[in-house]
Amino acid sequence: SYLRMVDDLGDIPRGLAPHSLRAVPVDLLPELVQAGRDLLGDGFPMHIHISEQQREVEECMTSCGASPIDSLADTVELDAHWNLVHATHVTQSELGRITSAGARVVICPLTEAYLGDGIFPASDFVFRGGELAIGSDSNVRIDAVEELRMLEYSQRLQQQLRGCLATQDGLGGHLWSSTAEAGARSLAMNAGKLEVGAMADIVVLNAHAPPLQGPRGQRALDALVTAGSRENSADVYVGGRQRIKAGQQEGQELLGRQFAKVVGGLLND
């Protein structure tokens, strides 16, 4: 039945995601990777939560004799198909191993702040040529703009500098486009960019939203990341199909009532 579910995905890319070295013994990973190749062929994406909290690192050092990232890199062949989620407590030498292998880091700034995990050295990683994607980690607040703001502001707090992830063209446009493209690559999807042949995933901003009044071009995207939120999106298209129109999702009222019913039932229990 599981394989039928996989087949039902159609053209949606499939991957392998052992949760973490806390949940999956590191010496089992080569067998899992081979099973993935047998099922999916070559080139599928692999995701794993790693070095998210200091206690995880300490326990891995005790049980494996090495940190989670080093244990992973010593056991499997890291490459561009691997996506290391969080990697909060990465060392400088581990950053070098990740970038040399071409592996990707996926950080979840709002969740990591909520849990008090720590701060990933994003600006250092990007300076080394590392590729950074953004995930939500199923946090209770799903907002891509807030994730990017938390990413940039955490670096500012850590380094006591401004514009840590900005380029000479600004902050917002670079952050949005680079993480969108990296996120698409982390899922082996032809998305995250506007070009012929790519998925038509498009966000149309509300130019009348207060944070976007006045700024134009790249400055508008700077304003979005520093002062805006998901509420500043007017229309959203996924694969060319409009999902949000004028800030409203199709069937939003019904979904709201269903959500309230489910939450009410959980709280009453």
Predicted regions and their residues:
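Catalytic core of soluble alpha/beta enzymes
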Residues: 52-103, 113-124, 138-145
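Short beta->alpha connector loops
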Residues: 22-23, 87-91, 111, 189
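Glycine-enriched alpha-helix->loop->beta-strand junction motifs that scaffold or abut catalytic
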Residues: 33-43, 77-80, 97-106, 127-132, ...
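Thr-Gly-centered strand-to-loop micro-motif
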Residues: 84-86, 107-110, 134-136, 239, ...
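Divalent metal-coordination and catalytic microenvironments
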Residues: 16, 49, 84, 98, ...
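His/Asp/Glu-enriched, well-ordered alpha-helical/loop segment
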Residues: 74-78, 123-209
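Metal-coordinating catalytic core of metallo-dependent amide/deamination hydrolases
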Residues: 1-87
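Active-site microenvironment of metallo-dependent hydrolases
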Residues: 174-269
